[in-house]
From Swiss-Prot:
EC number: 3.6.4.13
Keywords of the record: ATP-binding, Helicase, Hydrolase, Mitochondrion, mRNA processing, mRNA splicing, Nucleotide-binding, RNA-binding, Transit peptide, Translation regulation
Protein name, per record: ATP-dependent RNA helicase mss116, mitochondrial
Top-level taxon of origin: Eukaryota
Segments forming domain Helicase C-terminal: 341-503
Catalytic reactions of this protein: ATP + H2O = ADP + phosphate + H(+)
Function: ATP-dependent RNA helicase required for mitochondrial splicing of group I and II introns. Also required for efficient mitochondrial translation.
Any GO BP annotation: regulation of translation
Annotated gene: mss116
Domain called Helicase ATP-binding: residue spans: 116-307
Motif extent (Q motif): 84-113
Family: Belongs to the DEAD box helicase family. DDX18/HAS1 subfamily.
Amino acid sequence: MMLGAVRRYGVVHALRASVPRTICRPSNSQLLRCQTSPVTACPQSVRLLHKSSPFFSSASAQAQAQPDDLQSAAPQEPLREFTDLAERGLVDPKIIRAIVKDMNIKTMTDVQSQTLREILQGDDVLAQAKTGTGKTLAFLTPVFQNIMKDPSLKGLNWRRSQASSSDIRAIIISPTRELAEQIAVEARRLAAHSGVIVQTAVGGTQKREGLRRIQREGCHVLIGTPGRLKDVLSDSYNGVTAPNLSTLVLDEADRLLDDGFSDAIIDIQRLLPDPMKVDRQTLMFSATVPREVMQMVRKTMKPNFKFVKTVRDDEVPTHLTVPQKYVILRGYENAMPALLEFVTKYVEGEKENPNQRPFKAIVYFNSTVQTNLVYETFRNIVEQRHHPLRRVRVYEIHSQLTQARRTRSSDFFRAAKSAILFSSDVTARGMDFPDVTHVIQVSIPRDRATYIHRLGRTARANKTGEGWVLTHRGELPEFLKQLEGIPLNLDKETFATATVDMTKPELDPKSPATRFIQEIKDAVREVPESLKRRAYTSLLGPLRGYFARKQDLIQAINNCVVHGYGLPVPPQLSPTLARNLGLDRVPGVRIANYRGSSDNMSTRPDYRGGDRDMWASNSRRGREFNSDRRESRFGNHRNADDFFGGRRRAYRDDY
């Protein structure tokens, strides 16, 4: 271990790593002072150790562990400007040039100021930091510095790299493709003048293509998701190895473990060099520090790791400060008209109020099929030449898109001035989209934590934002129970479309809601019928436990697909699926009989109702699509994307 430290960090760092530390038990006031203010100085040789300290807490709804081995960082002279790092000889000037000149970032965030010095000293560090606080640059900067000072890589040339596939010095593990790609974008900007080569290994992309790129260009920093990283590193024939790995980073550690990646992370570590033979620094960044994270810390980090807490105990969480409202829908079929009404009124209001921020929203759904269906519907609307929303871009992100498509959606939405991103939960954590004015959640979220993380995509970087939830009246008791204590206010005035009975044969022509309902009906006709049928099935699973009676749930979903999506009757379920969902004896469920169709409907209402003529007048148009559309396993998608260009590839699942 000493030899590895000498080789990698020099004699001073090796001595620092090996000399016994002075341990003292500070007072509570000392602990708080060390956590909240980096200005107060204390001897560097003193390392604070606390046991069940009162300042170790989290705003997370999860039960928090009270670990007894968290070692707090000792405060020193503060770092405020990135140029300070170069002036004090802590970071190579080429890295600082990329940050200050190219990225135009001069002043550090609190997270960067509090973590950079500790990480640059070579210690293993567990940092508790929220997303959107600059933590990516906080770990990338020392990662690059470690590479730049590695004597075996002297002569790095940004004009001509001589890296190989076995030159990997840092591996960064991220829970999602989107976050991994986001980190990679920032890493490549940081590498502009250094000669450091950044590569990615994420699910949803062509593995062979990624391997060839690493083999052709080499790699110093490999960023990826657990499944693909394990796949790449476990292949002994591809030549991608990390025999001299100096840094391992786990970003969003709490989510990595929440998503069940613990075993994959352990497997990845087994594929890396023995840390007793090749010394490496391990960094973990996590918004919360539950027991699962501490268990991973003990398996991964050195015993003398540092804990840097950048979340103040008195800091009010986003979900307690952002204005939040909920709207009660008469039926699920009211959701799309309500969305259209809200967006249209806001955009039209921008003309009257030039100081109003451009509308930029993320709309969350609980299923990928719902996400795709609503995206296709709104896309048909914004493509209309004279529609008020013609200048609003629309994008979709969910796990059934290829990684290339998801990356393009993220990039375009991030850069857009006014846009709507229809998303599943793949963007709910860690993703940073600037200037998001609204987060709108359709239907009850899976759990309280999901609601909070989704809401966190707005009101970032000292900007304001709003949160809205459109919930069915049948979900209301469970919704209020789930989000008890969160300052949600009932809104009864904004949406004229929310309470309209769309099951009636005729709509009131004088109602302001009729305009939006009719626009949705016209647009959804162009959506493939196969996608609508799958949307019906996708609603059954997530909503099954939220209604008091299964019959009420089936009635609500049947109304949605008939009066909202325009299907003549609700789709049939296979006998096996109906039985597995416990719906085989529920009135209103149509069960397929493969000898000939039969229904299990004790009372079979006329689902075509008064809308029959409205839908029938364009039934042929609703079934026949332009030649530039084709059927895929996830629905009938356009062959070319007006906003992105290029051909849509087949969908792939996440690792």
